[in-house]
A protein has these predicted regions:
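Gly/Gly-Pro- and Ser/Thr-rich, intrinsically disordered tail segments characteristic of DNA damage-repair
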Residues: 1-204, 217, 255, 330, ...
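Short glycine-enriched, charge-decorated loop/helix-capping segments at active-site entrances
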Residues: 28, 284-286, 334
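Short Gly/Ser/Thr- and Asp/Glu-enriched loop/turn motifs at secondary-structure junctions
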Residues: 81-85, 123-126, 262-266, 311-315
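DNA-contacting surface of Y-family translesion DNA polymerases
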Residues: 160, 168, 173-313, 325-329
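Aromatic, loop-rich ligand-recognition surfaces of beta-strand-rich domains
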Residues: 322
């Protein structure tokens, strides 16, 4: 949202004059020693020329939803960990037909198109993928091929592995275990005496042998709707631009419908305007479909119901619903537009 801030020290947090705390900061600010949870007054002392701003959490959630939807375009198996982190399963022949590196590059390019950075790690399990994603932030893409996990992990400090905090790291240091390679070779009995049943799991993870599945929150629930929306950096005012945006969003919805084996009978078009309010329009189709050529054409007809010349469109969305499921629990899958 502020391209003029790029490359400059930026701090997000409370005011330094009111006992505020740093929520996060740019990499440029981190070079001065600033970090999250630091007192704002201390951060200002370390980096007096930093740009300060308060958190805009509605915007963060909006962009997060756009990123998660990009992931959902690639695979139905998306496990969201936090607002800015997710695991996805792109195992060739299982959920994705291409080499994982090609998929990862495409995701990276699409996320960059949103104006945000992402770092991607690709591996055979969550531990390896997460550590790989930390390698070259903020634009990194690191792939660890099958069979190379131990070599990749061996020289890294034990703190590189999630779940090993300061307390566990200190106990490992007392055992003269400093790297993941050393942890992978530690006797099982020794680790069990200190960490109990978690000791063996720690060792397996350090060996790169963890078995972990990506689990979607909606995996065993019935999908109620599949939708895609986008907030525009600049309001759309021309009908042609609005129609093009709806068509592009519809292509993504169509791909996801086909990937999940769904056909929908109701089309929903959603617009939000520059002054904050919004409207939706719906139409039921004579037959369920997963073909965007069909439901996008209907959405464009619905445009006349909720838009007129002169209206400034800030957000557009298109969705399909009314799927024919048998049993299950219904939940919305309204993904508007990663471990990333």
């Amino acid at each position: 949202d502020h391209p003029e801030w790029r490359g400059k020290p930026l701090i997000v947090g409370g005011d330094a004059d009111s006992r505020g705390v740093v929520s996060t900061c740019s990499y440029e600010a981190r070079r001065f020693g600033v970090h999250s949870a630091m007192a704002s007054a201390e951060a200002r002392r370390l980096c007096p020329k930093a740009i300060w701003t308060h958190g805009h959490f509605d915007r963060y959630r909006e962009v997060s939803a756009q990123v998660m939807a990009i992931l959902a375009d690639e695979t139905p198996r998306v496990e969201r960990v936090s607002i800015d982190e997710a695991f996805i399963d792109i195992t060739p022949g299982r959920f994705a037909p291409e080499d994982p590196l090609l998929v990862a590059r495409r995701i990276s390019d699409r996320v960059a198109g949103l104006g945000v950075t992402c770092s991607i790690g690709v591996g055979c399990n969550k531990t390896v993928a997460k550590i790989a994603s930390e390698r070259d932030k903020p634009f990194g893409l690191t792939i660890v091929r099958p069979g190379t996990e131990q070599r990749f992990l061996a020289a890294l400090p034990v703190s590189a592995m999630s779940g090993i905090g300061r307390s566990a790291e200190e106990r490992l240091r007392r055992m003269r275990i400093y790297t993941l390679g050393e942890l992978s070779r530690a006797p099982e009995s020794t680790l069990a005496s200190i960490f109990g049943v978690n000791g063996e799991r720690m060792r397996q993870r350090a060996q790169g042998l963890e078995i972990s599945e990506v689990t979607s929150l909606d995996e065993e629930r019935e999908v109620k709707s599949v939708s895609n929306e986008r907030t525009f950096a600049k309001d759309l005012t021309e009908r042609g631009d609005i129609e093009a945006a709806i068509a592009l969003l519809g292509e993504s919805v169509g791909r996801r419908l086909r990937r999940q084996g769904l056909t929908g009978a109701t089309v929903t078009l959603k617009l939000k305007y520059s002054y904050g309010s919004g409207r939706t329009a719906q139409r039921r189709l004579p037959h369920p479909t997963d073909d965007e050529n069909i439901f996008v054409a209907v959405a464009l007809e619905l445009l006349d119901n909720i838009w007129q010349d002169g209206m400034h469109v800030r957000l557009a969305g298109i969705g399909m619903s009314d799927f024919d499921h048998q049993g299950g629990i219904q939940t919305d899958l309204f993904l508007s537009l990663i471990h990333i």
